[in-house]
Amino acid sequence: MEDGFSSYSSLYDTSSLLQFCNDDSASAASSMEISDRIASLEQRVQMQEDDIQLLKSALADVVRRLNITEEQQAVLNRKGPTKARPLGQTLPLRTTVNNGTVLPKKPSASLPSPSGSRKEMVVPVTKSINRTSSSERVSPGGRRESSGDSKGSRNRTGSTSSSSSGKKNSESKPKEPTFSPEEGYVKMFLRGRPVTMYMPKDQVDSYSLEAKAELPTKRLKLEWVYGYRGRDCRNNLYLLPTGETVYFIASVVVLYNVEEQLQRHYAGHNDDVKCLAVHPDRITIATGQVAGTSKDGKQLPPHVRIWDSVTLNTLHVIGIGFFDRAVTCIAFSKSNGGSHLCAVDDSNDHVLSVWDWQREERLADVKCSNEAVFAADFHPTDTNIIVTCGKSHLYFWTLEGNSLNKKQGLFEKQEKPKFVLCVTFSENGDTITGDSSGNILVWGKGTNRISYAVQGAHEGGIFALCMLRDGTLVSGGGKDRRLISWNGNYQKLHKAEIPEQFGPIRTVAEGKGNVILIGTTRNFVLQGTLTGDFTPITQGHTDELWGLAIHASKPQFLTCGHDKHATLWDAVGHRPVWDKIIEDPAQSSGFHPSGSVVAVGTLTGRWFVFDTETKDLVTVHTDGNEQLSVMRYSPDGNFLAIGSHDNCIYIYGVSDNGRKYTRVGKCSGHSSFITHLDWSVNSQFLVSNSGDYEILYWVPSACKQVVSVETTRDIEWATYTCTLGFHVFGVWPEGSDGTDINAVCRAHEKKLLSTGDDFGKVHLFSYPCSQFRAPSHIYSGHSSHVTNVDFLCEDSHLISTGGKDTSIMQWRVI
């Protein structure tokens, strides 16, 4: 080795090379002399390359020996206290390995983290150091291998858009958790990486991994769903004879009685609902859904469910194994008692099929179009006629036996539109279409030719047509946001314009009396009349939703999302108190303990503070240029901790009841992005989780990390939202990849714990949840990853938010 090191140092002895380069006589030397010198240099370089290879080999041997030594030390630690050997005997070349250049590939909780501020720290591996060198920090060996992305590989904003995330548990047998009674910790494994969690001293003697946790005595019941899916779905808004308005969002069909302010929910689907149809009896309803993937990787096929809107009982399920990707259009027949149902799926051929739904038999199917299909409906007087429309097509289908025969709509002198967007029928049986050119076209009954045209009925596309009971036609425009009524001769009667804040009209339905219901692309449901104003009865977010904050003393909560909206909701009245448009996509939020202000963090590193009463901006700051995943005020209201994707926690001093902020500093030490934060009851300590499963502790007032286990293990935490920790590790399913659980929340009474996962499920556990594979009550409703959960101030309700499904669900604790 000494020869190797001498050769290694000679690698940097460049005096002879510099002398050669600076020697003026070299220019006069013969070509033979130059060739000799080059040959000599090449020989020297080759020798030095050989020496480098020798060094690499020696260093690899040192790393191997180091791993063996640390494994032996870990075994000794488990067996009990032993006298530590001298450092030089145990780790002869520890300082060489600790330069941040090479790390062993085997995870070791004893190695110092190679991240930024800790790179040059030399930590001898003995038992005593093991207990103080951030012993709850995971140091996965693969971290340096991905040093190109030091902030970790997982981006919380990029989670899958559905419970059909395709995640599968690890195929290899997962490691079981281990318990060290001597040290008083439990070690669990996520993706094979150890996560060490120390328990309170008073639990060490009585704790057993084999003990079984119990289910909570309380349960959840879905009470209210906020939001509506109008951004990419059509014909999904109807009024039922019960006085309820029916629509859907996520995997829930909502039946909303506006007058009585009550909701009922059909929850038979297991993934996104995409279409809805009401039977002529106005009681039976059909809904179609997308394909999905269950938690264990099994395929969940798209299908149609037919159910009773009074009892909410499922009557029939059709199409399992037949539909592909999703069911996008459905309709009941009208003239034969509604015994037939047609459906179009989202396969490449957009297959149109006709079913006897009561027998669950398919009567016929045919390739409809290579392009998108927007609507399919039976003719009101001829059961055998079906009309479909979409991109570049309008087709009239005739059901004859087991076949469907097609006639294409002939536009003739009329310019063919790019999209035929909607279809309805007149009292005399004419077919009426609205298209992307803004024209209303009337197709004579029984023909595929245009009998009348209303040119330029709207500026831009016509997204919706609705034939009212009195024969009045109502059309809804997209670009112009206008609602126009037409008489039987297609003469304009009334015109109303929907305010820009509500967005383009997506669907139109008839309400009670002269009331019109409107669904918009910005996920509003409006009601009003053609001669009056339209007011929202339902609204929701329009883009991915992550931020959730609960008011400390009122039944209110705030949500914020990538749609740049922050909305304060009244959980009793089930309506927004106010809505604020901010300049950047929002990711996180947190209420000041006084409830007077609320902080909102964004994807850009900026954060805002708003007055809760007036929604006025109090202050705005910027910390870094990456997303702020957590905004958490201390219990005494004197500090604000901000967890960022730049791996730092920014600490601000707070005064004047949340209106004045002074930067204290930042806590640096994590080697991946911050995911969760919690304050101690006395506001003196902070615990944080990161994207690579680290658990670190801090004194935020000094921005210093706390590495003493004896200091941190008995801290009482004001909240428990960290997904990693002794009191919550039982929430993790066996074989989890460490990203399955997005949010954790402990109830204020400290008896319940809720989680939201990547499979659209909300779980309710007993707290503390410190037994492996703890049982839970499981609730469905979200179709996307559940991004956040939190209990209202009095623990009477739980709020959950969906990511891509943009829904907010309010669960009553019973």
UniProtKB/Swiss-Prot annotation:
Keywords: Coiled coil, Cytoplasm, Cytoskeleton, Microtubule, Phosphoprotein, Repeat, WD repeat
Role summary: Modulates the assembly and organization of the microtubule cytoskeleton, and probably plays a role in regulating the orientation of the mitotic spindle and the orientation of the plane of cell division. Required for normal proliferation of neuronal progenitor cells in the developing brain and for normal brain development. Does not affect neuron migration per se.
One GO molecular-function entry: microtubule binding
A biological process from GO: hematopoietic progenitor cell differentiation
Family membership noted in the UniProt record: Belongs to the WD repeat EMAP family.
Protein name, as recorded: Echinoderm microtubule-associated protein-like 1
CDD domains: TD_EMAP1 (cd21947)
Annotated stretches, region: Tandem atypical propeller in EMLs: 175-814
